Amino acid sequence: MRIYSNPYELMSETARNIWEMGTEVKPKTYQNKVIEGKDEFITKELICEQYCLTHMDDPSPLFVFTKSKDWADAEFKERISGVMENPGKAWELRKDIWEEFLVNGFFDYTYAERMNETVSYKGKAFSKIGAIIELLKTDNDTRKAILNIYGEDGFNEDCDSNYLGGEHRIPCSMYYDFLIRENARGEKQLNICYHQRSSDFVTHLGNDVYLAWRLMEYVASEVGIKPGYLYHTIDSLHSYKKDWVKLKTSIQTELR
């Protein structure tokens, strides 16, 4: 597993890897849109890309292509708000990406819905993320602190597996897994293991990384423990042909 010490290393080396080692794939769908036969949506793809990010001193390289940190911060607030918001307000800061996916004023799903769904923990009602925080407080060694995003939607009584045909959008994120473990110095820290089925490198990866890191910091703070590392697995990490020129552009140049 590749270990990155900062977001600049992550973004610059991953861009190069996709360009040099990505294999071409011609997908038929993008979210809930049909793109079959559209040349600009041919992808370069890396399968089961895995890495560990150990520090987030400067997040700006994560937004080098999107300039979307304001959206990411607003989106994060909605995700931990305790309210199952749909569509919320954060999407308005990135209308160019999200507006086309509104259906009768709502999205097919939101992370705020999936993360704040009410569940029962030891006989009491909590949001899904709230239950995980309570579990981590009482059992530092647990392997059950999994915040699933993909799967059943208790709010709409839906199941993502019903929409494999593309009728609705389904989450690119599978789950976040929180593990409290000792680091090399013998200090307990809360790590986050983030598994995605799919991530668009140019349009979404930087946001995905930032939001996962913020989530780790938030849960660590609520539990009262030091935040640790992000372990990230992406089954299909890809870039669309319309964005390939950005893979060959120096990120340092883009940051200036």
Regions inferred by a protein language model and the residue ranges of each:
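Terminal, non-catalytic protein-protein interaction segments that mediate quaternary/complex assembly
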Residues: M1-R256
